[in-house]
Amino acid sequence: MSRLYAIILIALVLNVIMTIMPDSKVEAVSCEDCPEHCSTQKARAKCDNDKCVCESV
């Protein structure tokens, strides 16, 4: 029975990790789409070396 609890616990931890990870990933967004992309994150759009960077407001 303890194996079942361990498997459920591991599944829950993996679920939380998968939920958090995409937020920390840098997305390749062109400068044209940058303002629209950053507005969904409530951040200010900025272009660095032709890459979109969202700065916290």
Curated annotation (Swiss-Prot):
Any one of the GO BP annotations: envenomation resulting in negative regulation of voltage-gated potassium channel activity in another organism
GO cellular component: extracellular region
Stored Pfam families: Toxin_6 (PF05453)
Main location: secreted
Record's subcellular location: Secreted
GO molecular function: potassium channel inhibitor activity; toxin activity
Signal peptide positions (record): 1-28
InterPro entries: Scorpion_toxin-like_sf, Toxin_alpha-KTx_8/9
Disulfide linkage: 31-47, 34-52, 38-54
Function noted in UniProt: Selectively inhibits voltage-gated potassium channels Kv1.2/KCNA2 (IC(50)=183 nM).
Additional information: Negative results: does not affect Kv1.1/KCNA1, Kv1.3/KCNA3, Kv1.4/KCNA4, Kv1.5/KCNA5 and Shaker IR.
Record-stated family: Belongs to the short scorpion toxin superfamily. Potassium channel inhibitor family. Alpha-KTx 08 subfamily.
Domain text: Has the structural arrangement of an alpha-helix connected to a beta-sheet by disulfide bonds (CSalpha/beta).
Protein's name in the database: Potassium channel toxin alpha-KTx 8.5
Organism: Odontobuthus doriae
Taxonomy of the source species: Eukaryota, Metazoa, Ecdysozoa, Arthropoda, Chelicerata
